[in-house]
């Protein structure tokens, strides 16, 4: 029988995160670190680059594969779940401000508003937020994990 996917040369299995391990190993290891260092009863909130549903850019990859809540998920899904974009738009703007603002007090206020414990900075965030200055995150928190190009900052409380 012909397959929509063409001639499959190798068996991929059902491990849905395998591609991430191959394509974005730093993100993959960050997800494993989060799973090992958080508990289901006290899940922290993370902030990461948000995006569109099923995006080839792989936004929201940390929250999607770790199960840890994020400030905003895929925009269209969030919109459909809530029945309005009025909730989605301000959250997307807040995420942009976290990554692009130079005003540390503003960033702290937004992080507190959502109870963010971890800030993700990887390839996706660097590509999307052109004016991102990572030094500010070292000022408002500490690096708790780093693998390859992915850094996880824990927000100081």
Predicted regions span which residues?
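Extracytoplasmic
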Residues: 1-157
């Amino acid at each position: 029988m012909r397959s929509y996917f063409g001639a499959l040369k190798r068996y991929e299995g059902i491990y849905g995160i395998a591609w991430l391990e191959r394509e974005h190993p730093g993100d993959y290891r960050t997800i494993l670190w989060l799973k090992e260092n958080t508990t289901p009863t006290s899940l922290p909130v993370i902030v990461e680059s948000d995006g569109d549903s099923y995006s080839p850019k792989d936004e929201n990859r940390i929250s999607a594969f770790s199960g840890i809540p994020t400030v905003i998920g895929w925009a269209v899904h969030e919109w459909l779940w809530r029945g309005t974009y009025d909730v989605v738009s301000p959250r997307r703007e807040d995420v942009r401000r976290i990554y692009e603002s130079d005003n540390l007090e503003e960033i702290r206020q937004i992080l507190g508003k959502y109870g963010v414990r971890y800030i993700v900075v990887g390839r996706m965030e660097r590509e999307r937020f052109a004016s991102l200055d990572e030094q500010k995150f070292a000022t408002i928190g500490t690096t708790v994990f780093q693998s390859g190009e992915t850094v996880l900052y824990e927000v100081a409380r």
